Amino acid sequence: MGMLIRRARPDEAGLVLSLVRELAEYENLSHEVEATETMIADALFGANPRLFCDIAECNGEVAGFAVWFINFSTFSGRSGIYLEDLFVRPALRGKGIGKALLSYLAGECVTNGWSRLQWAVLDWNTPSIEFYKSIGAVMLDEWTVCKVAGAALTALAEGRR
């Protein structure tokens, strides 16, 4: 199997959005996808890119992707990667593609002197959790992810909360 991991190109915002939608469908979260191709293109390739996307190909076929951004740990005093999305198309799972994407990102961290690669996983996604544990990931059970969005975000911004 010929595998290639490469950075997404500016003409692939539609492909990236399609992969986001495939991931959302797998996670039963399709109803939450609000992103448009224009929004994805701007985040990845606009005047102030703040997002990165690496595409995995197998034998010339798009197999999956990793969407990530640079974060910072005040504890370590160094940057790291926050992996927003990792997805391998179902027909191509079990071939090492997910591990290759994570290895690629770990390499980015090591090469740049960054301290960590971090992400979240849905608690019901047992296959992914087991896979992540098998590559040395530690589940941070003592942490709870918080989110403020929609009307609550607006209210907070206006000082009503």
Per-region residue spans from a language model:
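A short helix-loop-beta-strand connector motif used in the catalytic cores of GNAT acetyltransferases and
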Residues: 43-55, 82
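Conserved active-site alpha-helix within GNAT-family acetyltransferase domains
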Residues: 99, 103, 123-142
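Conserved acyl-CoA
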Residues: 89, 100-116, 138
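Glycine-rich acyl-CoA binding loop
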Residues: 56, 94-99
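Conserved beta-strand in the GNAT
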Residues: 55, 61-70
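A short beta-loop-alpha structural element at the N-terminal edge
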Residues: 4-18
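Conserved GNAT-fold acetyl-CoA-binding loop/helix
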Residues: 17-43
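Conserved beta-strand-loop-alpha-helix junction that forms the acyl-donor binding cleft
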Residues: 119-128, 147-151
